[in-house]
Amino acid sequence: MNTPERFQLLSKTALVTGARRGIGKAMAIALAEAGADVIGVSQNLQKKGSEVEQEINALGRKFWALQCDLENRKDLYNLIKHVCANLPFVDILVNNAGTIRRKPASEHPDNYWDETIEVNLTAPFILSREIGKHMIKRGSGKIIFTASLLTFQGGINVPSYSASKGGLGQLTKALANEWAGKGVQVNGIVPGYINTDNTEALRNNPDRYSSILDRIPAGRWGEVEDLKGPVVFLASSASDYINGTLLIVDGGWMSR
């Protein structure tokens, strides 16, 4: 297999959570551009005719739209049961969906903590465990987590988010330790400061926006398209010997 062929995802099926917009939508489209069919999961994803579905269908790839509230454990297990019983084998699992709650730690309510941990950490673990079982049995699979710069840093006023993303970093390594020898590669992508809805509050704060921009050697905030190459790489056979890695895509922010 030559190098370009290693990046192709023809005959593969990817499940992407948070596929309706932002980073998840860009990742879903990127995987389709590389040849994969896509199962898109999001709480508010249109069952038919969404933008992501239209773009993926235009590429000649199949798209299945599934709605799921990842905070609802019963809803999540119903999703998994449906996928495993009725849809193609999931070759690539992209745990991208996430939520964030902003409030100082001394005022951070229980429900903020519980909701964030459930969506950002517990749901990805359950999805990985249940779909991972089938990957292990088959002897192949790719699992990718969307982590965060707050996997490494504490952040300000987002304790539940920081804890959840720190946990994802360790979960990536824990699963890789157990599953790498069974043909399943588990890795994470760490987006830097990307222009998405989640960073709107930061971008609307002139002081914070400037301080962040000043630290980015690339001289700009990232765009969702900057995550396309990394997700295709980690989903493809080009990354078969990469396990437990957190691939930082931040324009150099962490290097400062």
Task: Provide a role label for each language-model segment.
Residues 128, 164, 172:
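Active-site helix of classical SDR
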Residues 148:
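Residue(s) in the substrate-gating loop at a strand-loop-helix junction
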Residues 20-21:
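Conserved glycine-rich cofactor-binding loop
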Residues 125, 140, 220-249, 254:
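C-terminal substrate-recognition "lid" of short-chain dehydrogenase/reductases
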Residues 104-105, 109-117, 212:
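Substrate-binding pocket helix/loop in short-chain dehydrogenase/reductase
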Residues 180, 185, 242-244:
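Short, small/polar-rich loop/turn modules that mediate ligand/substrate recognition or access, typified
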Residues 36-51:
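Conserved glycine-rich Rossmann-like NAD(P)H-binding loop of the short-chain dehydrogenase/reductase
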